[in-house]
A protein has these predicted regions:
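Ligand-binding clefts of soluble mixed alpha/beta catalytic domains
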Residues: 1-542
Length: 542
């Protein structure tokens, strides 16, 4: 019996149990009372609408389930950012569905709500996927309006994207199933087709109370902007539905008539499960992020038939590169090796660290994948680039810059999985969020930060100690230990996968066994968008 394997397995399964528990809580939205209120109005919830709309026999993945987690407690919270975003299939067509959750502050927009909607549109644009908006929102959450209204990546960007997607020929369908007010009223009208549900859907720039205050006119909301008004008088909407299900049925019929998209042509054959048991990942992945392990053991439990054709196997060993398949799709894998390795020259290299040779290898491999039009999968467990005089004299900065250049300029779809550490410039070199991965997800074990908690706490402690000394105060060993523990606790909270997911630094926190489905759905989505730009590394320092 392998005691370490069993210890790891128990720890990881317990962490995943916590993940499922937190997901269940998030999916309750604004709570049972608000859900009952919706039902009493004859309306379905956001999640019920999506469940009814999507094909039951096809997979689906949810984007940003933890968005807003712990960010707005003073305002009563904002589960899932008050909007549910799912990539799934409607009438056999892969698409993005965005549904306002009216159980959360009547679907009002928090700052993170805008960010999540923009992420949904970004996914649709990058992959040329149809996008369906299920609208039921009271508009901007006024107490936080200064954080959502005027800036480039705020609320207004959504309508800019509406216009841009329309010009790109990306199908947009909007269904108004509740309130659609103020600036939000433009969204359905800027879509290709707009449906509205009779008696529950309404669209207006200003509601009846504001109209009364502004111009003295007395009018009720239904007459002002209900389904009959907009389908028979203003011509703003195209179809009137009797209820939520009737509207969603019409969307399904519309989606069924869409032409098939032109494909990028990424290679796919019949899918096969890994020969090695994927469940063993739980025992391989260490409890502590500082412990070494062989990343190849993880890869062989993720790829079809457990076949990984390694590129430059004996060179630059702290990064693994090679070709494989996931659910039949060809992929090029770039992964951090976490065990200590020994070079042919006898040099010992730390796992999870990027050295000059591994940076060179990864750069060349990324170029090869662009040449062959093979999507890239980055498996992150990186603590950064190697430091010290030997590395500096050897040109680690220019070698790292080449890798960052290759990642930034890559034109094939990129996908990132944060398995463990994702620290500092290593995050950039391994295709962090700033480098436009089509999807970026974290396992429960992922940590995203400038550096590890212990190291950061030591640096911050030194700064705090120096500040106290300037004031003439001295730290006793006991106070120093207490201050260190306090700083580390704060920092550890900020590097947790939940902190990152709440801010949409990642699209989701997933069970390792869900990785294959996420990558496969991501590549299938990317296959709808032919590559239009040539791969060009630009100027590099050799």
């Amino acid at each position: 019996m392998d005691i370490q394997f069993n210890t790891n397995e128990d720890y990881n399964k317990l962490a995943l149990s916590e993940l499922r528990k937190r997901l269940k809580k998030v999916k309750e939205g604004g709570g049972k009372k608000n859900l009952e209120k919706l039902h009493s109005q004859g309306k379905l919830s956001a999640r019920e609408r999506i469940e009814y709309l999507l094909d039951k026999d096809k997979p689906q993945i949810e984007i940003g389930a933890f968005a807003g987690e712990g960010m707005y407690e003073a305002h009563g919270g904002c589960p899932s950012a008050g909007v549910v975003v799912v990539i799934g299939y409607v009438a056999g067509k892969q698409c993005v569905v965005v549904a306002n959750d009216a159980t959360v502050k009547a679907g009002a927009w928090f700052p993170i709500t805008a960010k999540k909607n923009l992420r949904a549109q970004e996914i649709a644009m990058e992959n040329r996927l149809p996008i369906i908006y299920l609208v039921d929102s009271a508009g901007v959450y006024l107490p936080l309006q200064d954080e959502i209204f005027p800036d480039k990546e705020h609320f207004g960007r959504i309508f800019r994207n509406n216009a841009l997607m329309s010009s790109m020929g990306i199908t947009q369908i909007a269904v108004v199933m509740g309130s659609c007010v103020a600036g939000g009223a433009y969204l359905p009208i800027m879509s290709d087709e707009a449906l509205i549900v009779d008696k529950t859907g309404s669209i207006f720039l200003a509601g009846s109370y504001l109209v009364k205050a502004a111009i003295g006119e007395n009018i009720d909301n239904e007459t002002l902007g209900g389904a009959t008004t907009h389908c028979e008088i203003s011509g703003v909407t195209d179809y009137k539905a009797t209820d939520d299900k009737d509207a969603l049925d019409r969307v399904r019929r519309t989606m069924a008539k869409l032409a098939d998209a032109e494909k990028a042509g990424f290679n796919r054959i019949e899918a096969h499960k890994p020969l090695k048991d994927s469940n063993e990942i739980y025992g391989i992945l260490p409890k502590l992020r500082s412990e070494p392990y062989d990343m190849k053991d993880i890869i062989l439990r993720l790829v079809d038939n457990s076949v990984f054709d390694e590129y430059k196997e004996g060179y630059g060993q702290t990064i693994l590169t090679g070709y494989a398949r996931i659910e039949g799709w060809a992929v090029g894998i770039v992964a951090n090796q976490r065990k200590v390795v020994k070079t042919k020259k006898g040099e010992m290299q730390f796992g999870g660290v990027i050295y000059s040779d591994s940076a060179d290898k990864a750069t060349r491999f990324i170029a090869n994948c662009n040449q062959k039009k093979i999507p890239l999968l980055f498996l992150q467990d990186v603590t950064g680039f190697m430091v010290g005089s030997k590395s500096e004299h050897g040109g680690i900065i220019k070698d790292g810059a080449k890798l960052v250049n290759a990642v930034a300029n890559s034109v094939v779809p990129k996908f990132t999985v944060v398995i463990g550490n994702s620290y500092g410039a290593g995050n950039y070199a391994m295709c962090g969020k700033a480098y436009d991965p089509r999807l970026i997800v974290s396992w429960h074990s992922g940590n995203i930060s400038v550096m590890g908690g212990a190291q950061a706490a030591k640096v911050l402690l030194q700064i705090e100690t120096a500040n106290l000394k300037k004031k003439g105060e001295e730290l006793t060993p006991e106070k120093e230990a207490a201050l260190f523990a306090h700083i580390k606790e704060q920092y550890d909270e900020q590097i947790s996968p939940y902190y990152a997911a709440a801010r949409l630094w990642t699209d989701a926190i997933i069970d390792p066994l869900e990785t294959r489905q996420w990558i496969a759905m991501g590549i299938e989505a990317a296959n709808n968008a032919p590559i239009e730009r040539a791969f060009n590394l630009g100027v590099i320092q050799v």
